[in-house]
Amino acid sequence: MASSLLLALLFLTPTTVVNPKTEGPCPACWGAIFDLESQRELLLDLAKKSILDKLHLSQRPILSRPVSRGALKTALQRLRGPRRETLLEHDQRQEEYEIISFADTDLSSINQTRLEFHFSGRMASGMEVRQTRFMFFVQFPHNATQTMNIRVLVLRPYDTNLTLTSQYVVQVNASGWYQLLLGPEAQAACSQGHLTLELVPESQVAHSSLILGWFSHRPFVAAQVRVEGKHRVRRRGIDCQGASRMCCRQEFFVDFREIGWNDWIIQPEGYAMNFCTGQCPLHVAGMPGISASFHTAVLNLLKANAAAGTTGRGSCCVPTSRRPLSLLYYDRDSNIVKTDIPDMVVEACGCS
């Protein structure tokens, strides 16, 4: 197991680059010795660093505006639906986020209600807002109808007053949840980190007859954000079993409650980080575990024989396939973010 920790440090840390042609044996073959508890602590520290790095966070978020359990449960239920088919090819992936921002009330009266939505500054770092949905709850008298204008207000550069950029008309005829798909003006505002919506009924109504619900019915905006991904090639490998010393995948589970992160990570409760460990003889160099063909094995064996006695280089057991970690969490602004963090779960290992 001494090699497993070194491999995890070498191949799961994003900033580390390993060159198989480096002189000397593979670092996995070095004789460093760690007790089991030290290995576990270092692997947990590595998992925390990897998650924070890939979420572009310097430290875990401290929740400044906690969201009530009722509002969180309701928002997730409203957004939950059938799984959408991807439009991407199998060898192309894109990093996607869904960010949920709950409303703060800036102005409320009989005639209008103004809602403020705050998004993290990371939205402006090259991310594309693909869709913005506004969801709100209305309590309305029975057998009544009301027309409501929903205005998108933005603060333009070098201006101190909000400017009306677009307006939507919604017919309200019953109590319940209403959903409105917002246009490019709202998407641009979300990208800049702040969105203001103003709700104005067309006719005068009593204050008690039109109420935007709070607590479990708190209004929110859900923004879908996308970042271009990289090409992936999936390769198969083998899992570690028994006393085998060949290159394989060792399972390792990270429990978010154990590391004290269950307050800001909503789902899942943990994830299987996994890592690669084991030996790689020269004749299996470049093979994905033992799944390569017999012809490839023979060619590599010939190359190994030709190199015998002329080199001290070794082959390393490295990840050959990874998959993303689906995460639902609170960001610095207490917004709820749903995303897939790429390359977090090692699925297969092979020899470099």
UniProtKB/Swiss-Prot annotation:
The keyword Signal applies. Glycans are attached at residues 111, 143, 161, 173. This is Inhibin beta C chain. Its main location: secreted. It comes from Mus musculus. Mainly expressed in the adult liver. Keywords: Cleavage on pair of basic residues, Disulfide bond, Glycoprotein, Growth factor, Hormone, Secreted, Signal. Residues 19-236 form a propeptide.
